[in-house]
C-alpha cells in the first residue's frame, strides 16, 4: 500500500464529486451531521485562508476515490458553492484584499463578490490517498 498526496482546488473537488469520481458511501463514514452554522465556519476559514485539515481517500483500480475522512468538509464546500445554504448570522466578518471588513452573513455563494468567490473556488485542499488498500 502506497500513500500519495494531491492538492485540489475546491472547484476541482466539487467537479470530481459531481462526476462520481469521489465516493462517500462506505462503512467508515458517518452520515451528514454538520448544521449550517458549522458549515459556515468552514467557509469562513476558507475565506480567511486558514488551513483546513487534509482529507484521506483510497483510490481503486478505476481511479475512483473512496473517502476515509473528509465527508463533512467536502459536502459543506460543494453545497455552499452550489448555493444550497447561506452563511449563518453568527459567521464572523472577513477582510478583503484592501483590509476592509466584509460581512457576508445570510449570503449564498453566488451573492458573494467575485474576489470572495475566487478565494473559495481556488482554495487548495490537501488530499492524501492510498493505492492498493484492501478492506
Describe the residue ranges of each PLM region:
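Basic- and aromatic-enriched surface patches that contact anionic nucleotides/nucleic acids
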Residues: 1-12, 26-36, 40-135
Amino acid at each position: 500500500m502506497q500513500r500519495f498526496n494531491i492538492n485540489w482546488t475546491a472547484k476541482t473537488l466539487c467537479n470530481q464529486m459531481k462526476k462520481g469520481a469521489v465516493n462517500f458511501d462506505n462503512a467508515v463514514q458517518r452520515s451528514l451531521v454538520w448544521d449550517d452554522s458549522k458549515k459556515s465556519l468552514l467557509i469562513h476559514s476558507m475565506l480567511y485562508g486558514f488551513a483546513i485539515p487534509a482529507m484521506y481517500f483510497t483510490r481503486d483500480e478505476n481511479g475512483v476515490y473512496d473517502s476515509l475522512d473528509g465527508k463533512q468538509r467536502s459536502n459543506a464546500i460543494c453545497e455552499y458553492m452550489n448555493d444550497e445554504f447561506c452563511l449563518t448570522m453568527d459567521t464572523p466578518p472577513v477582510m478583503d484584499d484592501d483590509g476592509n471588513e466584509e460581512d457576508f452573513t445570510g449570503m449564498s455563494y453566488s451573492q458573494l463578490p467575485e474576489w470572495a468567490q475566487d478565494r473559495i473556488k481556488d482554495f487548495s485542499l490537501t488530499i492524501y490517498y492510498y493505492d492498493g488498500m484492501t478492506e
